[in-house]
Amino acid sequence: MDIHEYQAKELLARHGVHVPRGGLAYSPEQATYRAREIGGGKWVLKAQVHSGARGKAGGIKLCANDEEISSAAEAMLGRKLVTQQTGPRGKLISRLYLEEAVDIAQELYVGFVLDRKEERVMIVASAAGGMEIEDIVEKEPNSILRTSVDPGVGMQRFQAREIAFGLGLDHNLIGKATETIFSCYQVFRDYDASMLEINPLVVTRDGNLIALDAKMSFDENALFRRPEISELRDKSQEDPRETFASDRGLSYVGLDGNIGCIINGAGLAMATMDMIKIAGGEPANFLDIGGGASPERVAKSFRAVLGDKNVETILVNIFAGINRCDWVAEGVIKAIREVGVNVPLVVRLSGTKAEEGRRILADSGEAVIVADTLAEAAEKAVAAWRAAAKKKAA
């Protein structure tokens, strides 16, 4: 689960990390009012969306007076911000954050992520932060500092101090940097975060360290013990397809293709998507119906997939162990008759009760394309999609 920049900064500020003074705004009038509250002569207006690279996409504006603030707010609110991280759909800007401009002397980068392979927290830092950090990582990988933290003992202050020295900071900033890095780790740990990124962490001309931007993601499996974090969720920033599926207990990830996928098991789902691409198609989603799939659960899956208007074909691929193919087949027929499946449908059933499942499909009289193997299922799905697209274009 992601949260907004201003929410992440509130969490950081509670732990002693310095952030610019700022305020939330939902209208141009509120934005100009916030400027008067904050004071000063320059402000930065930021679109609050769950994405990085906002500056390059026009989501961050430096303003010097009320007119510039109002104009920038008017241009941002209500439109979708498209960045390299949002995909072509973009994300709606419904709130803005106005904060005081900061006189920057140097931009740094500090990030905290889970290294799942090593089962440790990895701290990544660079003396060159800002909008070009991705290019720096690619072109100058040796300039990136990496420190791993043993979860058994947690981060030690000497590690934070080593990072501060590694960033090449002036000696009078080492103490401040050590405390800032250590406090960021505490926020990461105490709220069950999966990612915390400060980019940039700036050195100001008067010798302070300020978190100028902040991104945080959280482990959804830990939200039951973090109700204060759950309350920060903004569903308007999430893929509505994923929200619909999540509310119904389905594991769903939206993609940008045209072939909807209903599959059991993450491994089979990924293999199926690979086969669809090899056959020349593009998957519209990842949907794992899980074990014990009842007819009702299968029907819910169809509703989730068909909620994406880009879906022009559906592929159901089931390898039943815990599941039963006859139950899945009943769910497919239930979905066709109750949900209304108006796109080509390819079904491959294998494993427990597979013969019974195929018989149910055959006896139903519904237009279901049956496949025996994974490769055949992917090829038939792509062929059906192409035929449907050709018919639609005619």
Curated annotation (Swiss-Prot):
The organism's place on the tree of life at top rank: Bacteria
Quaternary structure (record): Heterotetramer of two alpha and two beta subunits.
Top-rank EC class of the record's enzyme: ligase
Protein name, UniProt field: Probable malate--CoA ligase subunit beta
E.C. number(s) listed in UniProt: 6.2.1.9
SUPFAM superfamilies referenced in this protein's UniProt entry, alphabetically: Glutathione synthetase ATP-binding domain-like, Succinyl-CoA synthetase domains
Cofactor: Mg(2+)
One annotated GO biological process: succinyl-CoA metabolic process
Organism: Mesorhizobium japonicum (strain LMG 29417 / CECT 9101 / MAFF 303099)
Keywords: ATP-binding, Ligase, Magnesium, Metal-binding, Nucleotide-binding, Tricarboxylic acid cycle
Family in the record: Belongs to the succinate/malate CoA ligase beta subunit family.
